[in-house]
Amino acid sequence: MRYVEGSVTTGPKRISKIGLGTWQFGSREWGYGSGYAATDAADIVRRALELGITLFDTAEVYGTGRSERILGAALANDPDAPRRAYLATKIMPVVPVAPVVEQRAVASAARLGTRHLDLYQVHQPNPLIRDRWTMPGMSALRAVGLVGDVGVSNYSLDRWREADAALGAPVLSNQVQYSLARPRHGAALVDFAAAESRIVIAYSPLAQGLLSGRYDASNRPAGRVRSVNSLFLPENLDRAAPLLDTLREVARAHDATPSQIALAWAIHHPQVVAIPGASSVSQLESNAAAADLYLADDEYDALTAASDRFTPTTGTANLAALARSALRR
């Protein structure tokens, strides 16, 4: 496992380049079945720690708190987890004023069974309540030791800078959708992270499985989450074919899978980490192995060029297409 070097994190823990996203813990929409939360999730967390994964990401809205509870219970099985696990969760900023921020952090910590949140993130920008009303709550949480680092999620670069100013200290991270399917989404953020020793946390780094190479227009994925993702419309799967071909070509050169190469691309930049989910221990192991893959410059450039040529259809026109697709299933 590789770890981030030279970031402005306030604590002693290392942040792994490949982490574990736990949206699927306790969330029925992924279709993993009732036994997943009871047994598989704990096995996945245990194996993640064994493999050197330290970054575990969750949120209060994942399964309406169940993800935090499941993750906390799984980490409690390892007496060394408090020393090694870098625990990150998020507040959904419905009314993100300081007293609410403080209350929600206490509730998240209780569900996670911890007295310290290594990273507490604002899940998305509130368009009406600016960060100057939110960040005093974060400062108070840091002052009492409940929170170590402060992060944001789905923030533009300008809004990230605004959060910095409101906190009066570096906001360590910005968690955004960043992958070969959506590289333009985070390019400016990555440049900022490099200049300021921050971190970009890439969620959905495999584009919900698109970059695994398992799917095409004749073999589309099931499940409610992917059924509303326009990337899986037949026309977009056709458009993704050249990108997937390039992924497979690079994967063959490394005796790796397309998913592993997609993750290696995402974490190629020193200040980017990725938090793929895992439906099984074997998938987790495959994801973790991507941290040890190093892409040559020409491979990285070829993947980036193929990604730039991938232009999925987007916008309101997709709503009708998604509705038609759902009716055909």
Where do the language-model regions lie?
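A short, structured active-site edge motif that brings together acidic residues
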Residues: 82-95, 119-123, 177-178
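Active-site groove signature of glycoside hydrolases
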Residues: 112-128
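A structural motif
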Residues: 53, 114-117, 147, 271
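Beta/alpha (TIM)-barrel catalytic core signal, keyed to glycine-rich beta->alpha loops juxtaposed to Asp/Glu
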Residues: 2, 125-329
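Acidic (Asp/Glu)-rich catalytic clusters
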Residues: 12-14, 72-83, 106-114, 142, ...
